[in-house]
């Protein structure tokens, strides 16, 4: 009799195990509900490096521990938009890639096809450079280096239109196009705002002619700088720049308070009738380095208002979503930057990692990028600088913080 009871108990426990595992997966995370999120709010991710990662042998897994397609896993966890950066020609004369995912138009087309196959829209992020474009550098592509301004403007228009044509021909669902990346003070080598505005309009024209339903976004950063976004928005208005979305980067350890972010985005939205969003954000879940190449955070002097934990990471993402939502109807979404840029191998096998970074471009830069970007990539080339800000651990297993995009609509009923 005791044996039969024991057997029944064992069987009942076995039946409960899947439920217990699922509960355990979610109960480690607390997410406070964001009220009144619209159904079409963008939960986006930039996974520009994923093809280079996969070619380097990186694998991703679902919450059950089974190997999974990254795009299917993301859409199953609430992601509805994929962002991909596009560089004109990120290769040297011998065809060696500059790294950072070697993000040419072919890379964008493949990522776009996989995103579309999983029901997600694509944000095409044109840098109009052969490598990273950001506030520190906006270098023109090699092929445009000796063009006069009018020819450069024509080249930008044609390149944008041809690239979008290739993506449309591949059946990609393009929802938005970014004309430039973090263009605080430059675009394709131009720093005068009158000329930059003409370049913005050349890109915008190419988008409008391709598909009038595609949103045109312009992207800036450093919202913490007093008056910056008000000045930029007024300058764009004065130069009659045609765009729909004013996009901002927001990294909690660099870019000030969320209250300020909401305030400056609200001002742009209310004054000029623009949609607004966060095009890039991320946060650390560990201070550990996974691949032997140093990370951008945490570092001395940075403001870390959240714990460096998985829960802290989830809180940071949730609060950015809240900040954009607080703008009102004009606040359309948030993109997480490179959540899957994890180590190609452990830190203790650094030399093997270096070989993979050089061969497949799966680090932030290769040594070959030195000819184009000698002062930055030429000195600091290597692996992923954000593996500790990913939403996957160093072995490709999803962190509970990946669930935050699903939970913000409902919240979780418990707090640890």
Spans of features found by a protein language model:
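N-terminal carbohydrate-binding accessory modules
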Residues: 23-79
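Bacterial N-terminal signal peptides
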Residues: 8-18
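Conserved, mostly hydrophobic/aromatic
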Residues: 45, 74, 125, 177, ...
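Active-site beta-loop-alpha junctions enriched in small/polar residues
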Residues: 47-50, 87-89, 127-131, 179-184, ...
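Glycoside hydrolase catalytic-domain groove-lining segments
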Residues: 69-71, 213-215, 228-302, 309-312, ...
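Active-site cleft segment of glycoside hydrolase catalytic domains centered on the general acid/base Glu
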Residues: 97, 102-107, 133-237, 241, ...
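Aromatic-lined substrate-binding rim segments of carbohydrate-active enzymes
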Residues: 66-133, 193-214, 261-271
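Aromatic-rich peripheral "rim/lid" segments of glycoside hydrolase catalytic domains that contact
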Residues: 28-29, 267, 286-318, 323, ...
């Amino acid at each position: 009799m005791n044996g039969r009871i024991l057997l029944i108990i064992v069987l009942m426990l076995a039946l409960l195990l899947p439920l217990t595992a699922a509960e355990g997966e979610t109960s480690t995370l607390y997410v406070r509900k964001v009220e009144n999120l619209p159904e079409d709010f963008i939960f986006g991710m930039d996974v520009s490096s994923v093809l280079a990662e996969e070619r380097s042998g990186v694998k991703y897994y679902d919450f059950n521990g089974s190997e999974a397609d990254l795009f299917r896993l993301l859409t199953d966890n609430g992601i509805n938009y994929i962002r991909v950066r596009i560089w004109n020609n990120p290769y040297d004369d011998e065809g060696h890639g500059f790294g950072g995912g070697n993000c040419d138009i072919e890379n964008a087309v493949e990522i776009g096809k996989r995103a579309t196959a999983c029901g997600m829209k694509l944000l095409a992020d044109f840098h109009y450079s052969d490598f990273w474009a950001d506030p520190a550098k906006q270098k023109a592509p090699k092929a445009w280096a000796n063009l006069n301004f009018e020819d450069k403007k024509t080249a930008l228009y044609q390149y944008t239109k041809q690239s979008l044509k290739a993506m449309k021909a591949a059946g990609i669902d393009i929802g938005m196009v970014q004309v430039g990346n973090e263009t605080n003070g430059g675009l394709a080598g131009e720093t005068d705002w009158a000329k930059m505005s003409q370049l913005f309009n050349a890109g915008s024209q190419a988008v409008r002619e391709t598909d009038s339903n595609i949103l045109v976004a312009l992207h800036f950063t450093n919202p913490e700088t007093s008056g910056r976004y008000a000045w930029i928005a007024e300058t764009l208005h004065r130069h009659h720049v045609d765009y729909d979305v004013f996009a901002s980067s927001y990294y909690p350890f660099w870019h000030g308070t969320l209250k300020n972010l909401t305030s400056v985005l609200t001002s742009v939205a209310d004054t000029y009738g623009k949609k607004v969003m966060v095009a890039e954000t991320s946060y650390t879940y560990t201070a550990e380095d996974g691949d032997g190449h140093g990370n951008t955070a945490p570092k001395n002097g940075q403001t870390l208002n959240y714990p460096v934990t998985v829960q802290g990471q989830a809180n940071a993402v949730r609060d950015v979503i809240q900040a954009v939502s607080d703008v009102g109807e004009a606040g359309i979404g948030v993109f997480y930057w490179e959540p899957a840029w994890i180590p190609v191998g452990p830190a203790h096998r650094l030399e093997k990692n270096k070989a993979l970074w050089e061969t497949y471009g799966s680090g932030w830069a290769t040594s070959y990028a030195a000819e184009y970007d000698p002062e930055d990539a030429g000195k600091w080339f290597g692996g992923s600088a954000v593996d500790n800000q990913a939403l996957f651990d160093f072995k490709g297993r999803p962190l509970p913080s990946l669930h935050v995009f699903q939970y913000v609509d409902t919240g979780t009923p418990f707090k640890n």
